[in-house]
Regions:
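Acidic donor-binding loop at a coil-to-helix junction in glycosyltransferase catalytic cores
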Residues: 165-167, 188-203
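Conserved donor NDP-sugar-binding/catalytic core segment of glycosyltransferases
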Residues: 89-136
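Active-site-adjacent helix/loop segment of glycosyltransferases
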Residues: 207, 211-290
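N-proximal low-complexity "stem/linker" segments adjacent to membrane-targeting elements
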Residues: 1-25
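A recurrent flexible, glycine/aromatic-enriched loop bordering the glycosyltransferase active site
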Residues: 138-146, 151-172, 193-194
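Short aromatic/hydrophobic "clamp" motif used to bind/position activated sugar donors
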Residues: 77
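Glycine-rich, basic loop-to-helix element that forms the pyrophosphate-binding segment
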Residues: 56-72
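Acidic donor-binding segment of Leloir-type glycosyltransferases
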Residues: 21-56
Length: 320
């Protein structure tokens, strides 16, 4: 098996990036090449292992991943962010699990939702963002009608099928990735934060007929998990705007439009309406405690999404 490791970066991950490079070099199955897709106008980082090739591309979480990969001449690609640690056997394990389960895409569980505190699980379930699944022995993640996701609350097997995943690392054939036409989802990059770009990508893989897996025994670690999104008032507003603008577009494009069953569509409308109502109630609280800008960001995000859904650009996108 031959593969190429590709990394998207702004070049400012520092020691995390160095650890990523070193862990790639220590793989028992080494990549043919390491190609780093660096956002335009950013400097090449000083961290190195001496074998990386840099290619400048437009900036964006989607733009730096939805590429043609002409430079890749291997059948498989290991996709990485710039802050991921891989144990020496990681790629070998991912490849073997891919073959064992006759699947197309595999991603490690780098965000362990099932290990959250109970109060956090309850709160997120109430908001419709994410909820635990207690009796599911097939899926690790499933996309919900609210445009959120459900996660396996007690994973007891090394590998599960999935409809979504975290995106700092995944492994698949080059052609399988190209066939999902991820460049059609560049609308995600038009906000301050492209979230939920990972969910959009993996769910599109699933909708296109690819079998997606989550590995719980790879040992792969997202080194910067939970630190890059530390909140301040301005960032919180940008996150709220981005989340609800992109969530509404995702819901309409991936959940509502592809569903031709009137009753099922109605259930999806009710589910989204519930999630938005809960957020509206939160906005009232924001106003009462003096966080009116955060509340405004929610309404601005929804309005921006509505405008985009009416645009010629959106209407020209191929249907899922």
């Amino acid at each position: 098996m031959r593969y190429t490791a590709v990394i998207r970066t702004l070049g400012n991950a520092g020691m995390y990036y160095q650890k990523t490079l070193e862990s790639i070099a220590q793989q028992t199955i080494k990549p043919d090449r390491i190609i780093v897709y660096l956002a335009e106008s950013y400097e090449i980082p000083k961290e190195t292992i001496g074998v990386e090739r840099y290619i400048y591309v437009p900036k964006g979480m989607v733009a730096q991943r939805a590429l043609s990969y002409y430079e890749v001449d291997t059948e498989y690609i290991l996709f990485l962010d710039d802050d991921v640690y891989l144990p020496p056997e990681a790629v070998s394990r991912l490849y073997n699990e891919l073959q064992q389960y006759n699947a197309n895409v595999i991603s490690p569980c780098t965000f362990q939702n099932h290990k959250q505190r109970t109060l956090s699980k309850v709160f997120k379930a109430i908001t419709g963002k994410e909820r635990p699944m207690f009796t599911n022995n097939r899926w690790s993640y499933k996309v919900m009608r609210t445009a959120g996701f459900a996660y396996n609350n007690n994973p007891s097997k090394p590998v599960y099928e999935s409809q979504s995943n975290a995106g700092p690392c995944f492994f698949c054939k080059k052609n399988d990735f190209l066939n999902i036409s991820f460049g059609e989802e560049l609308w995600l990059d038009k906000t301050y934060y492209a979230l939920p770009e990972d969910q959009v990508m993996f769910y599109k893989m699933y909708k296109k007929g690819l079998k997606v897996l989550t590995s719980f025994d790879s040992g792969i670690v997202h080194l910067d998990a939970g630190t890059t999104m530390q909140s301040n008032p301005e960032r919180e507003c940008r996150l709220v705007f981005s989340e609800y603008r992109n969530k509404l577009i995702f819901w309409h494009r991936f959940i509502f439009l592809p569903d031709h069953n009137p009753l099922s569509r109605f259930m999806s409308v009710l589910a989204l309406g519930y999630a938005l109502t809960i957020q509206f109630i939160k906005c009232i609280v924001y106003f009462l405690i003096g966080k009116s800008k955060t509340a405004k960001a929610f309404f601005d995000g929804i309005n921006d999404a509505k405008c985009y859904l009416k645009s010629d650009e959106y209407k020209s996108l191929p249907l899922i």
